């Protein structure tokens, strides 16, 4: 772990090191991803079959790429009561939150008396990527597909990698089915993103791509942006805990360890505190709790490379550091956590008080856990239902309203040398020629 104390002579330099930007950009990965994308574009299903064999160890035919209704039914039959209850609880909260967040049509009159407004319609066909990796991200299926369902997207396409035997995790399959996936394909990685964007013989193209993934998935989304829209480019998980001397160090340590166990080894965790005693107590708690966790080997890698316990001079310095780091998750365990919220401008999600660990947001609270990472929170927000909606403006002018607008149109058309623009408006107020 990296430990930074106020008394350190190089304190400010260490803070700069802690705030160094994280990026999934890798020129080697990007070049490999370009090759995969081009192969899928050129060879379609044949390329998907080849890459599934190479990267996932599964031998499939093109006909086996789609998940069948029988498989979906079997996953539902296999789902036990605890899984059913957890999925239903999470989906209910996600849907409730998303319904409040969904954008709605509006209409009003402008200064000319014309009717102007916006209409919000769902994307007709969306693609959702659900990662595989060292742990099945069942919750990610809910945190993406549910939003598409609430938005009203009629076609929700899901791609997720299969195991060596060609099967999908039954819990993940159950969650995707429950949330509202209309099509599910056993294909992963950048080849899945390419298939959803360019289409193959089996997978028809989508209009927008959603979901997190590894460096290859992120590279594919970056390279294919412009062919379609994408949501975010989220990387490995991040959590920052701001704790004063009132925080329970057991809670702080548990939350840091929880976010370090995802498995990529690139997760980043920070504890920021004004208290030297708190820093020492959290360090001790991490050492005590680590041996009790099943994924301690994954966690240890993150502790060795990307874990920071940082003491700052005061809460003002803490807030400044948080805004520099722009963490994916920001927990505030201070005496008055709500007072700090208006001052935090770049966190993906904020969790207030000692009873609000990040894992609640990961699984059941309601907001989507697909959030910006690597400092992107300064420019991007987390996934919301309105990203599954497309906006269209609507304008309706009557003749009286057009008459009021004509002078302004003529002025701009003259300034820009576009007389056809001016004519397009003016002709509507001219008398109709006789004989027509």
Locate predicted features.
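A glycine- and small/hydrophobic-rich beta-loop-beta segment
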Residues: 262, 271-347
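Conserved small-residue-rich beta-alpha loop and adjacent elements
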Residues: 108-174
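Short internal beta-strands
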Residues: 154-164, 269-275, 282
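Conserved NAD(P)+-binding/catalytic subdomain of aldehyde/semialdehyde dehydrogenases
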Residues: 180-258, 262-268
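C-terminal core of ALDH-fold dehydrogenases
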Residues: 315, 323-436
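Short acidic-hydrophobic, aromatic-tinged amphipathic segments that line or gate anion-handling sites
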Residues: 3-9, 183-188, 309-314
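N-terminal Rossmann-like NAD(P)+-binding subdomain of aldehyde/semialdehyde dehydrogenases
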Residues: 1-124
């Amino acid at each position: 772990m990296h430990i930074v104390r106020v008394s350190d002579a190089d304190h400010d330099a260490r803070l700069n090191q802690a705030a160094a930007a994280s990026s999934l950009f890798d020129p080697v990965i990007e070049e490999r991803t370009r090759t995969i994308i081009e192969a899928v574009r050129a060879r379609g299903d044949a390329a998907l079959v080849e890459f599934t064999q190479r990267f996932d160890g599964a031998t499939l035919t093109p006909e086996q790429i789609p998940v069948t209704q029988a498989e979906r039914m079997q996953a539902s039959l296999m789902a036990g009561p605890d899984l059913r209850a957890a999925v239903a609880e999470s989906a209910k909260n996600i849907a409730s939150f998303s319904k409040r967040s969904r954008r709605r049509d509006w209409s009003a009159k402008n200064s000319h008396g014309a009717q102007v407004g916006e209409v919000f319609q769902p994307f007709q066909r969306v693609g959702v990527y659900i990662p595989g990796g060292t742990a099945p991200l069942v919750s990610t299926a809910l945190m993406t597909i549910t939003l598409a369902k609430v938005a009203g997207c009629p076609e929700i396409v899901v791609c997720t990698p299969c195991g060596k035997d060609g099967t999908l995790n039954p819990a993940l399959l159950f969650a995707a089915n429950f949330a509202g996936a209309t099509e599910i394909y056993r294909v992963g990685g950048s080849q899945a993103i390419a298939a959803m964007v360019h289409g193959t013989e089996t997978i028809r193209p989508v209009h927008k791509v959603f979901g997190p993934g590894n460096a290859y998935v992120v590279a594919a989304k970056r390279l294919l942006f412009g062919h379609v829209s994408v949501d975010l480019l989220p990387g490995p998980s991040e959590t920052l805990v701001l704790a004063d001397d009132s925080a329970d160090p057991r809670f702080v340590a548990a939350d840091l360890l929880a976010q370090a166990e995802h498995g990529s080894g690139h997760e980043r965790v920070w504890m920021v505190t004004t208290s030297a005693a708190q820093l020492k107590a959290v360090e001790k708690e991490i050492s005590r709790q680590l041996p009790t966790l099943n994924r301690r080997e994954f966690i240890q890698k993150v502790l060795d490379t990307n874990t920071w316990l940082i003491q700052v001079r005061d809460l003002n310095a803490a807030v400044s550091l948080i805004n520099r780091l722009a963490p994916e998750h920001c927990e505030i365990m201070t005496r008055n956590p709500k007072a700090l919220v208006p001052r935090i401008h770049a966190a993906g999600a904020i969790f207030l008080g000692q009873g609000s660990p990040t894992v609640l947001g990961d699984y059941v609270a309601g907001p989507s856990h697909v959030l910006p990472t690597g400092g992107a929170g300064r420019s991007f927000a987390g996934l919301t239902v309105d990203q599954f909606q497309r906006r269209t403006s609507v304008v309706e002018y009557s003749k009286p309203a057009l008459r009021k607008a004509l002078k302004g149109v003529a002025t701009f058309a003259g300034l820009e040398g576009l007389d056809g623009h001016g004519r397009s408006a003016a002709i509507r107020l001219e008398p109709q020629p006789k004989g027509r």
